[in-house]
Amino acid sequence: MTAKRLENGGHIDRSKALQFTWDGRALSGYQGDSLASALLANNQSIIARSFKYHRPRGIMSSGVEESGALVTIGTGAYRDPNVRATTQSLYDGLVATGQNAWPSVRHDFAAINNVFGRFLAAGFYYKTFMGLPPFELGKGTGIWMQYEKIIRKSAGMGRVERKADPDSYEHAHSFCDLLIVGAGPAGLSAAIAAGELGLDVMLVEQDELLGGDLLGQPNSDTLRNELIAQIESNENIRIMLRTTAFGLYDYGTAGLVERVTDHVLTPEPHLPRQRFWTVRAKQTILATGALERHIAFDNNDRPGIMTATAGRNYLNRYGILAGQEIAIATNNDSAYATAADLSKAGANVTIVDARREVANSLQEIASAQGIEIRYKSAPFSAIGRGHIKALELAQGSHGHWQASGSLSCDLLLVSAGWSPVVNLISHRGVRPSWNQENACFVANQDFLGIQTVGSASGLWQTNDCQESASIAVEQAAKAIGHTPNKNNTSTVLQPGGWESPIEPLYEVKIATKKSKSFVDFQHDVTSEDVRLAHREGYQSVEHLKRYTTLGMANDGGKMGNIIGLALMSEALGKDIPAVGTTVFRPPYTPVAIGALTGRSVDEHFRPLRRTPMHDWNLAHGATMTMAGLWHRPWYFARDDETISEAYVREADTTRKSVGLCDVTSLGKIAVQGPDATELLNRIYTNPFAKLPIGKARYGIMLRDDGVVMDDGTTWRLSETEYFMTTTTVHAAKVLAFMEELLHTRWSDLRVHVTSVSEQWAGCAVAGPKSRDVLRACVQNPAMMSNEAFPFMGVREGLLKGNIPCRIARISFSGEMAYEVYVASDYAPAMMDLLHDQAIIFDGCLYGLEALGTLRIEKGHVTGAELDGRVTIDLSLIHI
């Protein structure tokens, strides 16, 4: 590799040298470098190994689309795997290591997988080990279960640190009139226009510098500085750098993650590592830009192959000339500016253009710099192992290619078109449409206060990007209620802006020659994998995605999805629009779990709660876990049982005989008053007016937006009194919700709600022998008959020992079951009584793990479905 740092140029500070470590070797860079640029400057070619074949991977881009250079940052508990070297800011003392390789990324023993690549094609784990001919040895899943352990152990990229995360994280909320995502020329122009109108603007940029594409253009410093000066002088504009908008949600809500201290070795102790922002904006403008595409050709994953934009950015932003003999493969106009910049920096540049001809202005640019243009040409194969050394070229068009010679090079830059970043607007259900003229998907429609501008809407010229931003701000201001400038006139800008039309180019393949061309670089999905999926019937884009894992790596298919869709459309004999595209889901880029969790870790000042049976449970072998703020039995191990063995035994015993479970932590609310029935009718999705006294009813409670908030049973004790149970975690939330409704919306209702959770202790008695156990425990056995105590019935009586009790015949397991409640002081006595009888029937105690299993097998709602993200569509409409 022959990359070198230039003496001048770029947005780095050469007076501030930074020391860092790469795979144990001490290297240096400058303030303003990314880890990727610093590695390039130090001539580090192989940065990573691929997921499946362990092929060498180098730096392929300069931004969030990077799917090759994934590294691990930090040591010990601070280790962070799968970090893009292209987006990691360099800082003094940074420690970075390669991953998914042994003993190192330069010499990886697992690269032998590449030799057996024909046996590791798409879906191999479904077929290869499912029986070995001729005797079908291992037919079925038995032997697969053994292979699976090996496969899963070898799968993955970086290794997650098992120690507790020592970093802290925060949650924050904010509001604004206009949220602008992206601070390139379009985003900056939009912020200025909106700020001048007096709008409260939040400008979000994932990079550490404002400017976007302007940072990679050598003659744009004046424009960039002017735009930034106007923004910084306007107090209406809030700037958030190092902040990624990873998702858009209902009602103008956006999820942002601010990387507060990821760029320093030793942060201030009071600062979090990352901050998760929930922003509610009246209007949103997406100036998210576009990503450059690769081409599928033989060995297109070799180190030394990257996008043309990356080559230009490393030159003009970081002052690095990434090669001396540079080939640029393109099918569009944008690569010519890159070629000119590289040539001026001293490189010998050759343009390999798939088109028959280009505009005179482009020819003049090339001629002025002595750049050779090879028309109707494209790369067929990259030559070289650890780094590209030469190209085999092909001539032709429209899928008909013939070998045409070779070209020596130490760097190949690829520009096969641009894909507007429409991910965020797609989160709101807007499906992008195919623009044939520009060979890309664009969002042709705005959605409820969300607009795309600039190259995110398919505009390639800076002036057009800025004009589209002004138009969008005008429309946003009108929607908010502000009066825009009278002189502005809204026009519709059509995607495009190049002088010469693009020549769609996705794959270069010569029928008579074997090739291994990659579509998804991170997951090692090849073009042949896509064709295999087609032959095996996985022709829907969603099936293609899951069968081949195309686009399922942590880059989300930013570099390879379009190529995969094009290959599938070719196999189907359809146009790309007919094949469609997958739906983008948040997050746009990976988000640290810690950022989503925030401070909801470890113990807080809120007191931990224990049921009245806590000591009793421990004495009987319970292993405890946390459910909300409650300590609850997780499982009851016998001898040396593992949790897996224990919960299976507990569930099986409950199904066949009887099981006892401490359910005291369930929320319990007394609903009393003349209008108690009317209140229940309003807060539950199912009616309660006709519920007889002495009966219980299961109900679903929804939030205002139709999302499930809680479920539980409510028992009618008298004409004006009910006993409501809620889930453990949502008990306080449900009570607060009911109190809010009674104070603000339904203050006319004569109802009083009171938490009685600590007054009552509860035990679930489940299984076919549950009635026999209770019949032996109550003073009046006749009350337990099927006739006297029907399903969903509620009875009050006495347990032996004159213990007052309240019993309901309720099942959350599918078997006959009851819930027994007594005053909390009687809890240990109740458990002794029930347990002694359960043992007679070979029953057992069971914990939360078995309880969850029983609920799932029954088809009941589980905690995972009550997390505030699920609608009423839970197969519970019938209730």
Indicate residue ranges for each PLM-predicted region:
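Residues forming the flavin
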Residues: 1-25, 29-610, 759, 873
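Adenylate-forming
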Residues: 311, 878-879
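Glycine/proline-enriched, intrinsically flexible loops and inter-domain linkers
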Residues: 196, 512, 522-524, 547, ...
